[in-house]
Structures are given as C-alpha cells and as structure tokens.
Amino acid sequence: MCLRVLDLRIPKVIITYCPKCRTHTEHSVTIYKHGKRRSLSEGERRYARKKKGYGSKRKPEQKRFAKVTKKTVLKLKCSKCGYIIHREGIRLKKAELVEVGGR
C-alpha cells in the first residue's frame, strides 16, 4: 500500500456524465467545503450529553497510525441544468483548480 501524498492540479471545467440530463455535459468544478456546525442539532446535543461529567474521554485515544490528510471532495455543477454532483477524490495535501487552455 502506497501512502504517497500528492499536490494535484484540477481543471476548472470538465466534461462528464450528468445523471439529470442523461448526457455528457460540461461541468464547472469547485472544492467542497463543509458547513458550519449547529450546536442545537440532535447529534451535537447527544455528543454533549455523552461528553458531560467527570472521567474518561468519549472514545479511546488513538495509539497507532492516524491519517495525515483528508480526502478532497469535488463539486461538479452541470452547465445545462445546474445539477450538482459530489465526487470523492483522493488524499491530497493540496488541490489546485487551474484554467485549461486549448480550444
């Protein structure tokens, strides 16, 4: 298993399949960013309840190998219908969106 971490240049526009249009169309590419955490959501309240009180941590402390980077998720927006697809990428230190010339 190779644990090589990359820097990747991703084109701003790609042609790929749109499940809503059912054809291959141009998609604009952006990098997905997670939203703000809501402190009153059910999961957040459950987490706070479990964490409350004295004693140990909620989960055991990790002893061995931990991940160094997160997987980059790409948001592909169809230029025809505006449908957005999330596409999971690979582990990257840095993903850079670049303008591809040619046409």
Swiss-Prot record:
Q: Which Pfam families match?
A: Ribosomal_L44
Picking any one GO molecular function of the record gives: large ribosomal subunit rRNA binding
Q: Which gene does this sequence derive from?
A: rpl44e
Where are stretches of biased composition, namely Basic residues? 47-57
Q: What is this protein called?
A: Large ribosomal subunit protein eL42
GO process terms (BP) = translation
Annotated region described as Disordered, given as residue ranges: 40-62
| Cysteine disulfide partners in this protein | none
Instruction: Provide the function of this protein.
Output: Binds to the 23S rRNA.
Regarding protein family, the annotation reads: Belongs to the eukaryotic ribosomal protein eL42 family.
Taxonomically, which superkingdom? Answer: Archaea
Q: Can you state the subunit structure given in the record?
A: Part of the 50S ribosomal subunit.
Q: Does the keyword Ubl conjugation apply?
A: no
ZnF segments: C4-type: 18-81
Q: Which GO terms describe its cellular component?
A: ribonucleoprotein complex; ribosome
Q: Which residues bind Zn(2+)?
A: C18, C21, C78, C81
The source organism is Desulfurococcus amylolyticus (strain DSM 18924 / JCM 16383 / VKM B-2413 / 1221n)
Q: Which SUPFAM superfamilies match?
A: Zn-binding ribosomal proteins
List keywords of the entry alphabetically: Metal-binding, Ribonucleoprotein, Ribosomal protein, RNA-binding, rRNA-binding, Zinc, Zinc-finger
Query: Which coenzyme or cofactor does it need?
Result: Zn(2+)
What InterPro entries does UniProt report for this protein, alphabetically? Ribosomal_eL44, Ribosomal_LSU_eL42, Ribosomal_zn-bd
Give the co-factor note. Answer: Binds 1 zinc ion per subunit.
